A protein has these predicted regions:
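Short, low-complexity disordered leader/linker segments with a strong preference
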Residues: 1-68, 131, 153-160
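Signal peptide-proximal N-terminal region
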Residues: 89-109, 229-231
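Flexible loop/hinge segments that line or gate small-molecule binding clefts
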Residues: 145-185, 203, 294-302, 306-307, ...
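Exported/periplasmic ABC-transporter solute-binding proteins
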Residues: 262-263, 269-272, 276-315, 321-342, ...
Length: 361
């Protein structure tokens, strides 16, 4: 079988996107090796390490020349989504190189969506337009897990295979594959780290993005399940952005309502950065855990304003999503239904370690 390598590091066998097992979830762990002292300093000065999660491209099965993959994301703004798009674009380049496609025969992709994931109607309108153009495959990150039913049915009726990435939809029977972070694990990780920091006791709040988004539901579910193991911790508030008119005002009100708040978990990058921007009392010692290691959160960790970050590998997610979409267009190729990437904990002890660079935005 002819294969073209796209990563210099050892490829984890679990990443392979061939071989469908309906209902089974494949979890992919990177397990970065810790480097300390002189070794870490030396590697930090070198070029960013390549992502070990990127699979090889199997060229033994034909892809139709000129295939176009349409991507409709729930958001197109922010460092996380920039990384997702970069991974997708690099996957397209790697496929064209591996198959030796000329410019005229090249596989292409489009990346569209709203600039705010709360703009669900904008995403639906974009989906309608994209499906009408009859792409070879559709990749979707759903801003509202219940909102895309009609569009998914239309795609199915027109023979357009669908890969959902990042945030799933309610009716998964209409989806060929799902590629995402293990968001329940992300929530569990946040709960575990927060409980450890508080010695298993104290009042906490959860400040969250949209409740109607599947990835957020999974993070909250994992967090609640894990935090319940700490009898001394009380969850005083869970506030969803789509449940209030002004999220910033709602967070301020929660802090005033609970002056004894000991900890906070923010479920995505936007909410994390919004919380960091709030004016707090000088003597505030609330332990904060955020999501997705953006520039602002990295600085907050270094400054001691944030304990740490549960972060994802958006580049790998984007890369694998495109390869999966193209696999769904191949005849006779079975594709794993569900494949989840492990999140990683980022704090002051590993932020400068190149082994974790794919989780730093």
């Amino acid at each position: 079988m002819k294969k073209a390598a796209v990563a210099s590091m050892i490829v984890l066998a679990a990443v392979a996107v061939a071989g469908i097992i309906p209902g089974k979830t494949n979890r992919i762990a990177a397990s970065p090796e810790e480097n300390t002292g002189e070794e870490a300093a030396e590697e930090n000065a070198q070029e960013k390490v390549e992502d070990p999660l990127l699979p090889e491209i199997d060229t033994s099965v034909k892809i139709e020349a000129g295939s176009r993959v349409a991507v409709v994301s729930k958001n197109t703004e922010g460092q996380f989504w920039d990384k997702v798009q970069a991974g997708m674009e690099d996957a397209v380049k790697a496929v064209n190189e591996a198959y030796g496609f000329s410019k005229e025969d090249a596989v292409t992709m489009t990346f569209e969506g709203p600039d705010d994931e709360r703009e669900v109607e904008t995403q639906i309108n974009t989906l309608d337009a994209v499906i009408a153009e009859n792409p070879a495959a559709l990749c979707l990150s759903a801003g509202d897990m219940e909102s895309c039913q009609a569009q998914l049915e239309t795609a199915t009726e027109n023979g357009i295979p669908v890969v959902v990435f990042d945030s799933n939809v309610a009716d998964t029977e209409l989806v060929g594959a799902f590629r995402s972070t293990d968001n329940e694990k992300a929530g569990e990780m946040a709960a575990e780290k927060l409980s450890e920091a508080l010695n298993g006791s104290g009042k906490i709040a959860v400040f969250s993005a949209q409740e109607k988004t599947a990835s957020i539901q999974d993070r909250i579910s994992g967090f609640q399940r894990k935090i319940a193991e700490s009898d001394g911790i009380e969850v005083a508030e869970i506030i969803y952005q789509d449940g209030v008119e002004d999220m910033e005002a709602a967070m301020k009100e929660a802090l005033e309502k609970h002056p004894d708040l000991a900890g906070v978990y923010c479920t995505n990058a936007d909410i994390s950065e919004m919380y960091l921007g709030l004016k707090k009392p000088e003597d505030s010692n609330i332990v904060m855990i955020g999501t997705d290691a953006t520039d602002k959160q990295q600085k907050a960790v270094k400054d001691g304003a944030e304990l740490g970050i549960v972060s994802q590998d958006p580049y790998a997610m984007g890369y694998i999503t495109i390869l999966t979409a193209l696999d769904l267009t191949k005849e006779g190729v079975n594709v794993e239904k569900n494949s989840l990437l492990e999140p990683q904990w980022i704090d002051s002890t590993n932020m400068e370690n190149p082994a974790y660079s794919n989780y730093i935005y």
